[in-house]
């Protein structure tokens, strides 16, 4: 058998006379080598991350902030260089690229007087394509505008930029598997994106991996209370509805928005206690609770709110006639807790999913609403320039 293919890492050469068995053996060897190299890559990444962490730890014997910073300096420089590239491209090249304009059917393009990149993370940049398109008389959709620029000019410019960057630092242009060592892949298009802080955002996705979405059809949330498992599912849904409301209104009418929030509060105050109580796992109950009986509660300094709430529940259960119906709360158990209006304690808990209605303390719906819904909401709206809503503003008008 004459081998007709060329493999960069194979010991077999094109035109070499080999048997089928030799080819299968070589394939097996290359698969083992690929697996080994993949493991080495992962180990190296973990090692570098560990080195960065330990060298930046002030109690480490070889602590050195400058060396720690140098570990991540290259990746930091790459993202800064990428931001600079996109800003220059859209401010200098795109407005004056007549050939590109002709291909895209653009006859008018005003100067781009803002930075094209409005957010960058460790390995990604977000570009203001909608604002850029509005500077032109492009006739197509936003998605078509993005793809037209990429296919007709930008993709090649990005590739050349990365090749030049690697050459400047004398790096490898290809990885061991033959792929480019550095590439910038197009990920998604969004109708709009809302950031509250770094790595905390809401994306209203328009296109991703070849699939188009209508507004609000695919909303991705990262780092916010909507995604936290400790936030009750019912409350997460209320927050999700409000986020959709915000994404639908580019300019919020404060009066209408307050009416919407009041409606959400009405739903909240009509919910059962298990739907608005916070879920947490109890750790260190026996360590922090010294006394919890006969209305006397004594704790070790540093006790958490969920342990305090659990101790009140245990005390009430102990003196009730329902000791055989409900469990005592112990370390390791998952519980739900909430703020209470009862003068005996401002917090109360129960075993997760098993509310003890016979001796539940009354819930402080107003405080619970403020903590679970209003506080997370204010973090979102203040990030878009809307003043935080005080609790008093959401209070219902008296009926008499």
Residue ranges: model-predicted function:
Residues 1-47, 64, 72-122, 129-400:
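DNA-dependent DNA polymerase catalytic subunits
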Residues 47, 51-54:
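Function-dense linear segments that define catalytic or interfacial modules
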Residues 56-70:
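Gly-rich Lys/Arg/Thr-decorated short loops/hinges at beta-loop-alpha junctions or inter-strand turns
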């Amino acid at each position: 058998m004459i081998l007709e293919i060329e493999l960069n890492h194979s010991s077999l050469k094109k035109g070499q006379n080999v048997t089928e068995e030799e080819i299968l053996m070589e394939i097996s060897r290359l698969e083992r080598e690929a697996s080994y190299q993949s493991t080495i890559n992962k180990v190296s990444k973990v090692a570098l991350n560990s080195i960065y962490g330990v060298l930046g730890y002030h109690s480490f014997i070889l602590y050195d902030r400058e060396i720690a910073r140098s570990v991540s300096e290259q990746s930091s420089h790459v993202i800064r260089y990428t931001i600079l590239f996109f800003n220059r491209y859209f401010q200098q090249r795109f407005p004056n690229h007549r050939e590109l304009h002709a291909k895209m059917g653009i006859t008018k393009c005003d100067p781009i007087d803002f930075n094209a990149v409005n957010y960058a993370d460790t390995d990604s940049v977000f570009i203001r394509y909608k604002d850029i398109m509005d500077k032109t008389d492009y006739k197509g959709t936003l998605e078509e505008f993005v793809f037209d620029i990429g296919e007709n000019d930008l993709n090649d410019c990005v590739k050349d930029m990365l090749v030049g960057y690697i050459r400047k630092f004398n790096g490898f242009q290809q990885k061991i598997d033959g792929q480019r060592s550095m590439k910038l892949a197009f990920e998604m298009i969004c109708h709009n994106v809302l950031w509250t802080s770094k790595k905390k955002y809401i994306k209203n996705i328009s296109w991703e991996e070849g699939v188009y979405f209508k507004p609000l059809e695919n909303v991705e949330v990262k780092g916010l209370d909507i995604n936290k498992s400790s936030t009750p599912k019912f409350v997460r849904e209320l927050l999700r509805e409000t986020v959709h409301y915000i994404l639908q209104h580019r300019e919020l009418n404060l009066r209408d928005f307050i009416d919407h929030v009041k409606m959400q509060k009405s739903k909240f105050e009509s919910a059962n206690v298990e739907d608005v109580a916070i879920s947490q796992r109890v750790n260190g109950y026996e360590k922090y609770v010294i006394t919890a009986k006969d209305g006397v509660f004594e704790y070790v300094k540093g006790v958490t709110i969920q342990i305090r709430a659990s101790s009140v529940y245990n005390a009430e259960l102990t003196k009730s006639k329902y000791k055989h119906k409900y469990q005592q709360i112990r370390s390791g158990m998952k519980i739900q807790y909430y703020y209470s209006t009862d003068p005996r304690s401002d917090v109360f808990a129960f075993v997760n999913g098993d509310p003890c209605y016979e001796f539940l303390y009354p819930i402080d719906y107003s405080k619970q609403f403020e903590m679970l819904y209003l506080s997370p909401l204010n973090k979102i709206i203040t990030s878009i320039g809307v003043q935080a809503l005080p609790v008093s503003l959401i209070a219902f008008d008296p009926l008499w």
